[in-house]
């Protein structure tokens, strides 16, 4: 039976490349499949004791590394676009598109873990001895992703030594690590971009002053309502809760308190960047802030998916080797991996915590005509 979607030969453009036996060769050459498909060297086979699941292990990790390369490629292009004083809406749209691509890739990587879990612990044990001293900790590309995203060296969990020491005397790897540490990370560039959010200017709309005033009014209304509470215990509880909220707001309104939290590692953004992020969150329905809000949401998605990938990896490792054995690279294995699930590895932590500082929609300072005109132009 012929293909129902194929037209007859008379319908084809004379300039079209004819199908022939050379098509497969061209395809293979373009993708360099001879190298790609010949890169699965099973050490168990070299030892004349082939283990079937070692092939799956190699393929899965090679697929990870290929996708890591694409993520780095996208991050580098996004960083180039963000590294400018003015970012027009066309570039913002492109940044959003590429961040969304990274999100979809990471979802794919998270979903790859269950494929590895089709291998039983006993299957893994059959070839694990061939892996040492190799370790996932030695994935240069994953370290570059972390650095380009904005994971700080001081935030990293110690792994017997500095994370770059595992690359030994590999100058290419060490130079790549140093370059990723020295160049502006996505976090730094997003921070600069947020600091330039229109409407933050003290001599303009001055969102921050208006926001503080709205918070004061909101808390005053809460206190007034609490004082009308007839049950003394309930009243005291509500007043205590309001005071706690007041302290939370004070941590963003007092620059010194904010800076102390940054130094302690509890916050990442500068004070100005935090103001910009809050303003974009409040006015995300305004056309000018729609794309920036999408951008911030995608950054959170990336952080979340990397955390999910780490978590899935941790659970898989525990299933394969338990929680007491050392990793093949000499790390504490499960214990080390579990420690990377903390907020210290969450680059855009401040975006996740923005909901802490929300106020009711009706209390959000309305945009005046001057700022609306500025946002349009």
Swiss-Prot record:
Please give the InterPro entries that the UniProt record associates with this protein. Answer: Trp/Indoleamine_2_3_dOase-like, Trp_2_3_dOase
Protein's pathway:
Amino-acid degradation; L-tryptophan degradation via kynurenine pathway; L-kynurenine from L-tryptophan: step 1/2; Pigment biosynthesis; ommochrome biosynthesis
Q: Keyword Cytoplasm, does the record have it?
A: no
Keyword presence, Iron: yes
Which keywords are on file for this protein? Dioxygenase, Heme, Iron, Metal-binding, Oxidoreductase, Tryptophan catabolism
Q: How is the cofactor bound?
A: Binds 1 heme group per subunit.
The job of this chain, per UniProt, is described as: Heme-dependent dioxygenase that catalyzes the oxidative cleavage of the L-tryptophan (L-Trp) pyrrole ring and converts L-tryptophan to N-formyl-L-kynurenine. Catalyzes the oxidative cleavage of the indole moiety.
Give the similarity note: Belongs to the tryptophan 2,3-dioxygenase family.
What this protein is called in its record is: Tryptophan 2,3-dioxygenase
GO MF, any single term: metal ion binding
Which GO BP terms, alphabetically? L-tryptophan catabolic process to acetyl-CoA; L-tryptophan catabolic process to kynurenine; ommochrome biosynthetic process
Q: How does it assemble?
A: Homotetramer. Dimer of dimers.
Gene that specifies this protein: v
Disulfide bond sites = none
Class in the EC hierarchy, top level? oxidoreductase
Enzyme Commission identifier(s): 1.13.11.11
Listed binding positions for substrate are 57-61, 128, 328
PANTHER family in alphabetical order:
TRYPTOPHAN 2,3-DIOXYGENASE
Instruction: Summarize where heme binds, as residue positions.
Output: 313
Reaction(s) the record says it catalyses:
L-tryptophan + O2 = N-formyl-L-kynurenine
User: What cofactors does the UniProt entry give for this protein?
Assistant: heme
């Amino acid at each position: 039976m012929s293909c129902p979607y194929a037209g007859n030969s008379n319908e084809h453009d004379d300039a079209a490349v004819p199908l022939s036996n050379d098509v497969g060769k061209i395809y293979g050459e373009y993708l360099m499949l001879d190298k790609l498909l010949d890169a699965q060297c099973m050490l168990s086979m070299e030892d004349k004791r082939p283990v079937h699941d070692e092939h799956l292990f190699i393929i899965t990790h090679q697929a990870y590394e290929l996708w890591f390369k694409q993520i780095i490629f996208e991050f580098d292009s996004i960083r180039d676009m963000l590294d400018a004083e003015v970012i027009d809406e066309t570039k913002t749209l492109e940044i959003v598109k590429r961040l969304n691509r990274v999100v979809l890739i990471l979802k794919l990587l998270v979903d790859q873990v269950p494929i590895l879990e089709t291998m039983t612990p006993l299957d893994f044990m059959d070839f694990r001895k061939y892996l040492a001293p190799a370790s996932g900790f030695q994935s240069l590309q994953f370290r570059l992703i972390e650095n380009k995203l904005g994971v700080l060296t001081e935030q990293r969990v110690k792994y017997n030594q500095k994370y770059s020491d595992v690359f030994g005397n590999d100058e290419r790897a060490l130079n790549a690590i140093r370059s990723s540490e020295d160049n502006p990370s996505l976090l730094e560039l997003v921070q600069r971009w947020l600091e330039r959010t229109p409407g933050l200017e003290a001599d303009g709309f001055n969102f921050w002053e208006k926001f503080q005033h709205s918070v004061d009014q909101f808390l005053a209304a809460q206190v007034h309502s609490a004082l009308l509470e007839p049950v003394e215990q309930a009243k005291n509880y509500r007043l205590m809760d309001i005071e706690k909220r007041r302290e939370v707001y004070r941590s963003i309104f007092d620059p010194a308190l904010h800076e102390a939290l940054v130094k302690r590692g509890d916050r990442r953004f500068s004070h100005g960047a935090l103001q910009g992020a809050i303003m974009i969150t409040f006015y995300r329905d305004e056309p000018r802030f729609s794309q920036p809000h999408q951008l911030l949401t995608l950054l959170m998605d990336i952080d979340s998916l990397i955390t999910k990938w780490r978590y899935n990896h941790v659970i898989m490792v525990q299933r394969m080797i338990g929680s007491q054995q050392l990793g093949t690279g000499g790390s504490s294995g499960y214990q080390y991996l579990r420690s990377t699930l903390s907020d210290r590895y969450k680059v855009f932590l401040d975006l996740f915590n923005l909901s802490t500082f929300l106020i009711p929609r009706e209390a959000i300072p309305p945009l005046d005509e001057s700022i609306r005109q500025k946002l349009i132009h």
